[in-house]
Amino acid sequence: MIMKILSNKYILSASLLMLGGAAMAQNLNSAYFTEAYHYRHNLNPAFGDSCNFVSIPVLGNVNATMRGNFGYQDVVMKNPMYGQPGQKRMTTFMNPYISTGDALKGFNKGDNKIVGDVNLTILAAGFKAWGGYNTIELSEKTNFGMVLPYELFEFAKNTGNRNYNIGDVSLRARSYAELALGHSRQITEKLRMGAKLKFLLGVGAADVELKDMRADLAGTDQWVISGQGTAQVSMKGFTYKSKESEYKDPSHVSPEGTQGKYQHVDDVDVDGFGLGGFGMALDLGAEYKINDDWRVSAAVMDLGFMNWSNNMKAVNAKNQFVFNGFHDTTVGSGSGGTLDDKMDSYGDQLSDFANLKDMGDAGS
């Protein structure tokens, strides 16, 4: 039951992230073919413009994109029991009245991915000079991604007495400011080339991973759920706040060897604000005019690096939770072997598995 709840929690978080991103998604890649679009240089630095421009601060260009190999309709479905008392029109793919085949057909057999980008142009200008067209742009960019293995959805939908090799679950996010300087020019009558140099000023980065997740439920004597959880945040002034808590069973020993007590991350703190990382990138592009009707263009984007500092890392103290039932357990009070004692033991195990321990700065 605990394992089912944990799985459903992860799926719910994934679904909410997907819904939030899908609501704001506006894919503007079609602007690649619109010559009047002033920001085409963001898609290919070789593209120029027929006129000079200055953007309205902040409101000049707002772009949000979202893409993935599964969508809202794969998670939220029509309820086959709709019309019955208490049943709503829509439900999730985990509804027991939806067949496993129908519930899982929208998910990739390998990794299922969702990625998104939000780009807010703060200031931008384009002008003709120095034998070509030039652009200057200051923008705030945020990108995020999520990878969910097929086995996670399978486990959530159809938990049974078998072993599940779920694999790796990961979520990541990056936020940074970008100062970009671009120049494009005609090389020949038919060939135009351009380049853009970008300076990247990191605001923050976060990575959450659950590696090597397994749920071994085939055994008759015990069930085991395992996985290594890691949370790493790179942000100026960011720290994890830890506290000491007591186990329910005073004799329980923590993974660090402390009896009756354990340290765990309880909160986070950001002391001040500053540069969390620095990087540089280069865009290269070209456009070739075959004739008045046909043009061929190509671009290579974001060739560069980003180096983050203050990489604060936390991991789960223990990578395994073992449930071996309630054998030889009494309901009444007494020393050892009672139902309450067993529940306390499982609760303490779960605390070791689910809570994070501060590991400090992991380095660049």
Model-inferred region functions:
Residues 1-28:
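Bacterial Sec-dependent N-terminal signal peptides
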Residues 28-31, 152-364:
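Outer-membrane beta-barrel porins/channels
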Residues 3, 125, 136, 183, ...:
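Hydrophobic/aromatic pocket-lining and membrane-interface residues
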Residues 1-4, 11, 44, 223-224, ...:
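Short intrinsically disordered, low-complexity coil segments enriched in acidic
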Residues 15-18, 94-98, 254-262:
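Active-site-adjacent bridging/hinge elements
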Residues 1-6, 40, 164, 168:
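Intrinsic low-complexity, intrinsically disordered segments enriched in polar/basic residues
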Residues 21-142, 146, 205:
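N-terminal, post-signal peptide beta-strand-biased segments of exported outer-membrane/organellar beta-barrel
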